[in-house]
Amino acid sequence: MADLRTRYLGLELRSPLVASSSPLTGSLDGLRRLEAAGAGAVVLPSLFEEELALEGPGEPRPDAGPGDRAGYGAGPAAYLSLVAQAKAALEIPVVASLNGVSRGGWVRYASRMEQAGADALELNIYYVSSRPGLSASEVEWHYLDVVRAVRRATGIPLAVKLSPYFSSLANMAGPGGRPR
């Protein structure tokens, strides 16, 4: 068999196939199946800070149907447990994913994911300003501020999921592709 080893985020992968967030990456059984099928790494579904009004299980929404209730209110404890279980069960890198809202939330949950054993972290940043006068550079600054804050708080590799709506990714990346 061909040697498909490669590197992603500084991590050695046995193959270039990275299973992105999907229903399969949301369970330990699905993660094991992906590893057995040849995935080189897995990206867990995002933990959404704005959905975490409480640290523990929440009450189901009144409008939720029976199929919606299974994972509702799982909160960060269940997510961090999945990170820890995946790390213990798999031989491939586990990338946790975070969609934060507040600067403190980005840092707090990123640190917890690292402590749970994540090999790397995907920052799923999607910032939509409701302020009409906010300039593009101010929006970019928000993204860079989040990345810098998480970088200072953690020691694992970071990937940043960007919106396709940036007007100048090269400018945002700065000289030589290095963040400003």
Task: Identify what each model region corresponds to.
Residues 1, 16-19, 70-72, 135-136:
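Short linear motifs at secondary-structure transitions and domain/linker junctions
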Residues 27-59, 74-95, 99-180:
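Alpha/beta enzyme core
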Residues 1-18, 79-87:
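N-terminal amphipathic alpha-helix/helix-capping segment at the start of soluble metabolic enzymes
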Residues 9-14, 63-66, 91, 128-130:
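A generic short-segment signal for beta-strand/edge and adjacent turn/coil regions
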Residues 57-70:
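Active-site gating loops and adjacent loop-to-helix segments of metal-dependent hydrolytic enzymes
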Residues 21-25:
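Glycine-rich phosphate/pyrophosphate-binding beta-alpha loops
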Residues 9-13, 70-73, 100-101:
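An N-terminal domain-start capping segment
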Residues 11-20, 66-69, 157-158:
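Short, basic, glycine/proline-bearing loop/turn elements
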